[in-house]
Structures are given as C-alpha cells and as structure tokens.
C-alpha cells in the first residue's frame, strides 16, 4: 500500500481527455475525445474504496444523483474485476463489499455541515485495514481527512465550483486527483489542477425505453430557482402542453421557495406530484413527450437529462453549464438560448427519434463507460503515488 504524500500532483497531470484549446468547440463528455483505453493499464488487481455521502442509502429510492452515480459505478467496477469496497450509510445494497459509516443522516439536517464532518471524521479508521490502492471520495468534507489516512485520493466535484467552493476545490487539487463532471464545470475553475473529466453515467437496462410518448412534458429535479420551475410552467403554458412537476422539496429553503413562487401557479394544466422514485419516476420519464430542463445556473452535469434520454425521452433545455455537452441539439433534444424559445422547442419534441436518445446514452453515458473512465483515473493516480514514494536515486 502506497502512502500518499500530498505533494505528488505538483507539476503532474492525468486525464481521460486532452485539454481543449481556447475557442475550440466544446467536447461532449464520454465522446472519443476522452481517449481510448489506457495502454498502460496493468493486470494487477486494483483495490478501491468508494466513499458516498451520508444522506441516503445506496441505491437511492428517489432523489439522489450522487448516490445513484456511486451505486452504478461500484456495480460496474465489480463487473470489470475491480475489488471495490463501498463506504456508505445504512444497509448494503450493491454488489461491492460494504463498510457502513453508520445510520443515514437525519434528513432534516440535509445541507448542514455537521453530518458531513462526522461522516468524514470516521474515514481514517474505516480505511485503515482495507489495503486499498486508491480512495474515491464523493463527499464534500471527506477529502479533508485524506492526509490522515494517507491514501491516494480521487475527488469528484459533484456540485458548483465557483466562489468559496472554488477556493476549496482549488486547494484540494494540490494534493488529490480532482475530477470534473464536464468541461463546463472545469472551465468554471481553470486555476484548479484538474486530473480528469469524467461524465456521469447510468445503467441503461434499468430505464424502460418507450418510443410512443404521452402528451405531457416533465419537470423533474430539485425545488430550487436554479432549476427553473417557474420557467418550466411558463413555457408549458405558452406551448399549450400539460406539465407534470416532480421534485425533491424537503429542505427549508426548498419548501419556502415552493410555497412562495411555485404553488400559486399550480392547477389545471400543471400537476404537482411531489418527490418520486422507483417505478413511478421511471414511468414518468419514459412517458413524457420531453423533459423540460430550463436551468438558471451553470449546471455541472445534469443526471436527469441522461436518465430521460435512456428512456428515449428528448430533452428541451436552456444553454447553461454542461447542457450543450450532454444534449445533441436536433438529435437528442433541443438546446435553447433564451426562455422564449422553449415553447417552440417543446412543440418540436416529436421530431427527435427516441432510439437516438437511447443510443447516445448507451454509447457515451453508460455505467460501463463511467467505470472504464474511472478505472483509468484510479490506475494513473496509484501510479503517480508510487512514483512519488520512491526514494530519490
């Protein structure tokens, strides 16, 4: 086992894709531009610990993009022959080995720091006897204890990287392999030492494909002004298309925003169904004429877009953040520059071939692609750590 020195990344870069030059066309995550299989991939068994957040069991029942990604990733890594141990709260729910971090954190505390800090503080002890080559941390606070457990660490930035979070991730990138979800996210923090860009993925066979769609459009996500629920209502009504709204609405800020800005607009052609998961979520995704994604922030990725596409459902979205990297305009959906363009795009959703939507997910955004990309990052991270640990000649 190689002990991480915290300095191995100085002057060193690993990546699943080359940097794009200034002004070049944005590369689509998962496309071949991210590179072929690493010819240096070894045959030695790779041992990885994947750390999930403290908020939900894996796999999640309803909302939980990070948890869904972690669940699909560890299962796909196991299928590739990687020895994976999942560190997560609650009960064992994947094919990976499991080490519980404790009970699921109180959902009333979601968004607060203490559960994250307590979760992170346990990691050195939990990792001490696992003998892993690399730790893949998907939490916010967990990377802060990397120096304590001394293991090479890969950190995925699952959220925004601007402002104070940018300062945080920039500092982390000095001693850990920092992974972006998209080129857009990476571009929001160009001063960080990004190690790789690895787009999210889903397991396609878990999403029911439907070629024939119903009339409704779907808004699915989190109840926040960033996600554009009011813009979704306005667009659907302007297009004369019924809208089904399903969103996580648990935290105080989410509830307050819903009651103030969204609830007064409901009724008639706009149906609120609350937070959904399981079969209900899949049926809504598969039956919708389109997923409406009118975001008002720099979205790092947008997992719900590839979930919809896996069901053969096109995406109608605003051009913010990673949207142009995920949605192929005119092939898997319509990317609009202004909210006023959304109604017309919704009326053209039938022009998108559902089979193309599914094919893009299978080719670029599958769990198999996700695992292959991360295995490449893990192996390179371990190799850099071994090289740094060698005594100077």
Stretches with model-predicted labels:
Residues 2-5, 10-393:
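Catalytic cores of nucleotide-sugar-dependent glycosyltransferases that transfer UDP/GDP/TDP-activated
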């Amino acid at each position: 086992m190689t002990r991480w020195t915290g300095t191995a990344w100085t002057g060193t870069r690993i990546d699943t894709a080359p940097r794009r030059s200034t002004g070049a066309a944005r590369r689509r995550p998962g496309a071949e531009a991210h590179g072929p299989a690493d010819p240096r991939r070894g045959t030695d068994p790779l041992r990885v610990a994947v750390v999930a957040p403290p908020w939900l069991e894996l796999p999640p029942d309803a909302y939980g993009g990070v948890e869904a990604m972690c669940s699909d990733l560890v299962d796909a890594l196991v299928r590739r022959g990687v020895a994976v141990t999942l560190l997560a709260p609650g009960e064992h729910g994947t094919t990976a080995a499991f080490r519980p971090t404790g009970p699921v954190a109180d959902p009333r505390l979601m968004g607060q720091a203490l559960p994250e800090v307590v979760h992170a503080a346990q990691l050195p002890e939990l990792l001490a006897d696992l003998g892993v080559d690399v730790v893949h941390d998907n939490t916010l606070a967990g990377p802060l204890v990397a120096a304590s457990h001394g293991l090479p660490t890969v950190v995925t930035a699952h959220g925004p990287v601007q402002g104070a979070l940018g300062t945080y991730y920039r500092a982390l990138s000095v001693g850990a392999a920092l992974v972006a979800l998209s080129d857009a996210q990476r571009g929001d923090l160009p001063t960080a030492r990004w190690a790789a860009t690895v787009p999210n993925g889903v397991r396609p066979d878990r999403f029911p494909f439907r070629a024939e769609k119903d009339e409704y459009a779907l808004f699915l996500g989190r109840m926040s002004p960033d996600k554009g629920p009011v813009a979704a209502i306005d667009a659907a009504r302007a297009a004369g298309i019924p809208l089904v709204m399903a969103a996580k609405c648990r935290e105080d800020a989410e509830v307050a925003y819903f009651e103030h800005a969204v609830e007064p607009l409901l009724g008639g052609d706009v149906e609120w169904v609350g937070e959904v998961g399981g079969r209900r979520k899949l049926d809504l995704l598969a039956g919708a004429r389109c997923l409406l994604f009118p975001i008002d922030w720099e979205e790092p990725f947008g997992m719900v877009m590839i979930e919809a596409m896996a069901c053969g459902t096109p995406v109608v979205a605003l051009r913010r953040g990673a949207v142009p990297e995920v949605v192929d305009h005119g092939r898997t959906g319509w990317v609009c520059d202004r909210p006023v363009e959304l109604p017309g795009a919704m009326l053209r959703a039938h022009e998108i071939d559902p089979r193309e939507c599914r094919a893009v997910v299978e080719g670029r955004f599958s769990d198999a692609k996700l695992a292959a990309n991360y295995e490449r990052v893990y192996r390179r991270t371990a190799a850099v750590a071994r090289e740094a640990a060698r005594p100077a000649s």
